[in-house]
Amino acid sequence: METRDDLRNVAIVAHVDHGKTTLVDAMLWQSGSFRENQDVAERVLDSMDLEREKGITILAKNTAVRLGGTKINIVDTPGHADFGGEVERGLTMVDGVLLLVDASEGPLPQTRFVLRKALEQRLPIVLVVNKVDRPDARSSEVVNEVYELFLDLDADESQIEFPIVYANARAGKAGLAPDDLAPDLRPLFDTLLDAIPPPAHDPGHPLQALVTNLDASPYMGRLALLRIRHGVLRKGAPIAWCRASVT
């Protein structure tokens, strides 16, 4: 098996309104994904009218940022329990998770649900304590509550030893201590690259990919979002699509 050291696949999971989509916006801006004069709306990945109206993510969305020679594929998952299937779908695409928790509210019911799913898949986790700028922030207590949640979910010793990053996603700042944030998200990017492993695959194996979402474009027709597990996908190559129940 070979590893793609130039890639990272990560999902951002959290309870609703803990700042996932705001953090993705900041990561996109700071990675140079937009031109300085480009007019970009807030909540870039929220494309549905209901998502923008309610300020929530309903469907798992994907985007990517480039940091030096590394491409970071990011999946923004829903933060509401009613869309748990989308969370599970997103976790099949990644090799690690950014668990975002509000520095005041701490872990809430959906935090427990998404964390359980990530632990079941044995995905490495980076804890991001967001909104540390809030007047009622209680970062140290929240970290302890997250540790207790890991123990309550029967996480083993290796899973409990997770790195912690503190952030103010709206301001685009992060750091390794709640009272010492860098002027940008560099500490978060560095921790992500160090803690999330690169994907492994066998390029000599026949093509094997998992389709996680379908879409349509007026210009390109039907689109399939997939993760390549093994092999190589080449333009013009004939591909057989199979349902999971087909042997």
Language-model features, listed with the residues they occupy:
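Structural and coupling elements of P-loop NTPases
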Residues: 1-247
